Structures are given as structure tokens and as C-alpha cells.
Amino acid sequence: MTDQEFLDLAERLLLAVEQDCDRINDETDADLDAQRVGGMVTLVFANRSQIVINQQKPLHEIWLAAKAGGFHYRYDAAQGAWLDTKGAGEFFANLSRYATEQSGLALQFSAR
């Protein structure tokens, strides 16, 4: 994968996260704040806990930091998904789980 291909895929992922935050705020009482700075999105929940998602261009990875830990994801073209580098699942499924754990509400994130 070229750097530009990575950046395009990573941008789609971050945009999907931001759009899901808007949808979640419209549909629930989650009061979820998505703060975007360059290649990083910080999700801030009503209880002030955070999840940080950022691009790691040199490694062609997306990193996710949550209370549950730090996780690295690489894009798998065959599956069309961002997968944990240690085999712990797909990015959006994991983000949904970690956001639910941290917010105390059932929150769902998905790829576009």
C-alpha cells in the first residue's frame, strides 16, 4: 500500500467515526464530543473519559487508545476492514465495545 492509499483509507475511517458521533448525539443522550486535530480524533464522553484514534503514517496503522488499552490496526484489503495487528478483531466492532464500556450506553460505530 502506498502512503497516499493509506491516507485515503485512514481519512475515510476518521470521517466515519466523526459521522457516527454526530448520529449518536442525534439519537441518544450520550453527549459524545469528537475533537479532530489533523490525523487524530479524540472522543470525549459525558463522564470525561476519552478514546483517542490516530493515524500512524510510517507504519500504515491506525492506533486506538481506550481505558481497555492501546490497540494497533492495519487495513486488510482482502476483508476490506481495519484489523487488530494481534488478532483481536475489527476496528469498528472494537470501538463500539470500548465506547459502550466507557460511556455506559450501547453505542454503535460502523464503516461507511
UniProtKB/Swiss-Prot annotation:
Where does the source fall among the domains of life?
Answer: Bacteria
Any one of the GO BP annotations? iron-sulfur cluster assembly
| Cross-referenced Pfam families | Frataxin_Cyay (PF01491)
> Which keywords belong to this entry?
Iron, Metal-binding
> Among the entry's GO cellular component annotations, what is one?
cytosol
- Identify a single GO molecular function assigned to this protein: ferric iron binding
The record's listing under HAMAP family reads:
CyaY
What job does this protein perform? Involved in iron-sulfur (Fe-S) cluster assembly. May act as a regulator of Fe-S biogenesis.
Give the UniProt family note: Belongs to the frataxin family.
Protein name, entry field: Iron-sulfur cluster assembly protein CyaY
